[in-house]
């Protein structure tokens, strides 16, 4: 689903709109009187009296064109809790082809920094879908309109969360690709695209890896017709030459186990053996998009572990980059 978040001044037609309000953990709603009609207030108040207040979210359908959503912001929430609340909200309203909701930011009662920013961030992350190879693609749209003058995320906060979301979605796209598409050759090509984000990308192919003495990494990919690679991704956002933070991720695009073959019931999942590298790649993209004031380097090894006449055998001995031999 495509989610678009807009910041507007007011609702054009409050009689035919789905409106979201925040309350405290006791679902006190007196602060809503100025936002709804008397009949709507009384109706919601009566329904709450017979509701299980242990829940976080209530959706009340006032008529065929209007819903009222109440969301409880409990005390002592962490930022992860707030993001999970946004994800839960998305799960409650994620139906139908197109929909539109108005979030009244003035009703945020929780005293948390960037509460609404984290809430919307959780919603966006939950909305991720991978339908690239679906025969029938159905486009669905969700418009989230934030109204009110209080508690709106600042422009800087919006930029931060957008960068995090793009990095997360890039990583999820990589993990979701099947092994016959995202093999090491294709993976390396896609990482070159990060250069447009002002990241420095260096790709070491098999010839360079052999020269460096990285025979341990090369050994894993010996049985594949695809190449093996080491990729470094650098972000230099600090003003000084401080030592970078380093992130290393495993990028085995498919791991059969080699001659120590994986059990058949687990084999299909071995396409996810590159998820560690995807996390590193997504992180580096996010750092670049938010122009983080740090120096960082991401390192990923990209290989495919297959069975063939030239694959590495159990008991083989190779020499690693450090000079140590490994059996």
Language-model regions, residue ranges each:
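Short amphipathic alpha-helical segment within the helicase RecA-like ATPase core
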Residues: 1-251
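Glycine/charged-rich beta-loop-alpha catalytic/anionic-binding loops adjacent to active sites
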Residues: 66-73, 169-173, 243-247, 253, ...
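Active-site pocket-shaping loop/turn-to-helix segments
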Residues: 77-82, 270, 274, 327
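Conserved protein kinase catalytic core
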Residues: 78, 261, 307
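A glycine- and small-aliphatic-rich helix-loop capping segment at beta-alpha/alpha-beta transitions
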Residues: 117-124, 221-224, 262-271, 313-320
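Alpha-helical metal-binding/catalytic segments enriched in His/Glu/Asp
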Residues: 191, 245-247, 260-304
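Gly/Ser/Thr-rich helix-start
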Residues: 220-224, 250-252, 256-259, 277, ...
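A glycine- and small/hydrophobic-rich beta-loop-beta segment
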Residues: 292-327
């Amino acid at each position: 689903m495509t989610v678009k978040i807009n910041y507007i001044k007011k609702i054009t037609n409050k009689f035919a709109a789905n409106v979201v309000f925040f309350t405290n953990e006791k679902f006190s709603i007196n602060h809503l009187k100025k936002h709804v009609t008397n009949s709507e207030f009384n109706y919601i108040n009566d329904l709450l009296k017979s509701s299980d207040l242990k829940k976080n979210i209530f959706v009340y359908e006032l008529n065929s064109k209007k819903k009222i959503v109440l969301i409880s912001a409990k005390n002592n929430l962490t930022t992860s809790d707030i993001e999970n609340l946004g994800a839960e909200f998305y799960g409650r309203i994620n139906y139908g082809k197109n929909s539109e909701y108005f979030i009244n930011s003035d009703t945020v009662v929780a005293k948390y920094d960037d509460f609404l920013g984290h809430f919307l961030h959780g919603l966006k992350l939950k909305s991720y879908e991978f339908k690239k190879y679906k025969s029938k693609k159905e486009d669905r749209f969700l418009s989230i309109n934030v109204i009110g003058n209080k508690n709106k995320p600042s422009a800087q906060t919006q930029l931060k969360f957008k960068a995090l979301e793009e990095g997360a979605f890039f990583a999820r796209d990589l993990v979701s690709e099947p092994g016959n598409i995202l093999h090491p050759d294709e993976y390396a090509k896609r990482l070159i695209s990060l250069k447009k984000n002002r990241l420095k990308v260096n790709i070491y192919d098999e010839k360079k890896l052999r020269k460096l003495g990285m025979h341990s990494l090369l050994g894993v990919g010996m049985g594949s017709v695809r190449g093996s690679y080491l990729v470094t991704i650098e972000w230099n956002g600090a003003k000084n030459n401080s030592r970078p933070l380093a992130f290393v991720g495993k990028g085995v695009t498919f791991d059969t186990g080699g001659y120590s073959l994986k059990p058949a019931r687990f084999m299909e999942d071995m396409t996810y053996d590159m998820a560690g590298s995807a996390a590193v790649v997504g992180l580096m993209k996010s750092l670049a998009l938010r122009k983080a004031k740090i120096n960082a380097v991401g390192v990923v090894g990209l290989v495919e572990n297959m069975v063939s006449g030239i694959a590495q055998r159990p008991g083989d001995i190779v020499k690693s980059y450090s000079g140590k031999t490994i059996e």
